[in-house]
């Protein structure tokens, strides 16, 4: 009995120390991704992403992007958490799309296609969205999600690592410069890929970078770079982590042209 009590106490202490170090947001993400999801996979079969797609196919209306978004939001808020941009931050994204009306958008990180559907439904006629996804299983689900929403003609999925695909955009994908970039992939790639976009001449004066999850999990090096560089004019939009009451935010960084930067690598 004493040993059990001591063990429980040590586990509680370890949890509290982890919570203090990481914060509620990262601990919650870890719980959902590494504890809850494997259990659900075992009990329900398939993957979480496949279950999200199946829910959309069963509950959304084909050819209706808004109903697709609502079905994903309902599933992820009531059944299984997933790292989509979500409706709270999604409304901020909508406002940015409506303000700038981009004709060519690059998305880094497609996941299940939520943000691709969200952006593509608001793009003006003739506009296109290129979305990069390193995981071929996620890319396949994104394609099915776009097909179901009726947006397949507006979006092209590029499968591979962003650092490999970005240098190919001009020659292989007929890109001159980008009007908007949505960053929502690996957080440690935000800064390197921003630098790569600059180096490849893919940004023009007025190109909008919109970065998700800059607070949780967090992108401190990216924020330090864009906020400290005269090449960018930044605006922070405080919001909540998708499907949680945990503070997160989006960072908008509008490219002003080459300037002084605190980071050179």
From Swiss-Prot:
CDD domains the UniProt entry points to: AdoMet_MTases
Catalytic activity, reaction form: a catechol + S-adenosyl-L-methionine = a guaiacol + S-adenosyl-L-homocysteine + H(+); 2-hydroxyestrone + S-adenosyl-L-methionine = 2-hydroxy-3-methoxy-estrone + S-adenosyl-L-homocysteine + H(+); 4-hydroxyestrone + S-adenosyl-L-methionine = 4-methoxyestrone + S-adenosyl-L-homocysteine + H(+); 2-hydroxyestrone + S-adenosyl-L-methionine = 2-methoxyestrone + S-adenosyl-L-homocysteine + H(+)
Residue ranges, Cytoplasmic side: 1-2
InterPro entries hit by this protein: Catechol_O-MeTrfase_euk (IPR017128), SAM-dependent_MTases_sf (IPR029063), SAM_O-MeTrfase (IPR002935)
MF (Gene Ontology): catechol O-methyltransferase activity; magnesium ion binding
Residue ranges that the UniProt entry lists as topological domain Extracellular: 20-265
GO cellular component, as recorded: cytosol; mitochondrion; plasma membrane; synapse; vesicle
Enzyme class: transferase
Lineage top rank: taxon: Eukaryota
UniProt modified residues of type Phosphoserine: 260-261, 265
Cofactor entry: Mg(2+)
Residue positions binding substrate: 187, 213, 242
PROSITE patterns reported for this sequence: SAM_OMT_I
Keyword annotations: Catecholamine metabolism, Cell membrane, Cytoplasm, Lipid metabolism, Magnesium, Membrane, Metal-binding, Methyltransferase, Neurotransmitter degradation, Phosphoprotein, S-adenosyl-L-methionine, Signal-anchor, Transferase, Transmembrane, Transmembrane helix
Cofactor note: Binds 1 Mg(2+) ion per subunit.
Membrane spanning residue stretches: 3-19
UniProt entry tagged with the keyword Iron: no
Record-listed S-adenosyl-L-methionine binding positions: 85, 107, 115, 133-134, 160-163, 184
Positions contributing to Mg(2+) binding: 184, 212-213
Function: Catalyzes the O-methylation, and thereby the inactivation, of catecholamine neurotransmitters and catechol hormones. Also shortens the biological half-lives of certain neuroactive drugs, like L-DOPA, alpha-methyl DOPA and isoproterenol.
Similarity annotation: Belongs to the class I-like SAM-binding methyltransferase superfamily. Cation-dependent O-methyltransferase family.
Name of the molecule in the record: Catechol O-methyltransferase
């Amino acid at each position: 009995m004493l040993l059990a009590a001591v063990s429980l106490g040590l586990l509680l202490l370890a949890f509290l120390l982890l919570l203090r170090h990481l914060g509620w947001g990262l601990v919650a993400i870890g719980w959902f991704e590494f504890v809850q999801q494997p259990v659900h996979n075992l009990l329900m079969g398939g993957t979480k992403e496949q279950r999200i797609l199946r829910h959309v196919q069963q509950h959304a209306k084909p050819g209706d992007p808004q109903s697709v978004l609502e079905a994903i939001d309902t599933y992820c808020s009531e059944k299984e958490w997933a790292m989509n941009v979500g409706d709270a931050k999604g409304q901020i994204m909508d406002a940015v799309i409506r303000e700038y009306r981009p004709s060519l958008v690059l998305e880094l990180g497609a996941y299940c296609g939520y943000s691709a559907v969200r952006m593509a439904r608001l793009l003006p006629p003739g506009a296109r969205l290129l979305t990069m996804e390193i995981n071929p299983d996620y890319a396949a689900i994104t394609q099915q999600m776009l097909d179901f929403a009726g947006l397949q003609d507006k979006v092209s999925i590029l499968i591979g690592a962003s650092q490999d695909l970005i240098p190919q955009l001009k020659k292989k994908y007929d890109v001159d410069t980008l009007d908007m970039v949505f960053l929502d992939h690996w957080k440690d790639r935000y800064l390197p890929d921003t630098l790569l976009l600059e180096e490849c001449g893919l940004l023009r004066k007025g190109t909008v970078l919109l970065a998700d999850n800059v607070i949780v999990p967090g992108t401190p090096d990216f924020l330090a770079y864009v906020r400290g560089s005269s090449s960018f004019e930044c605006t922070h939009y405080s919001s909540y982590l998708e499907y949680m009451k945990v503070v997160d935010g989006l960072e908008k960084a509008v490219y002003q042209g080459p300037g002084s930067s605190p980071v050179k690598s």
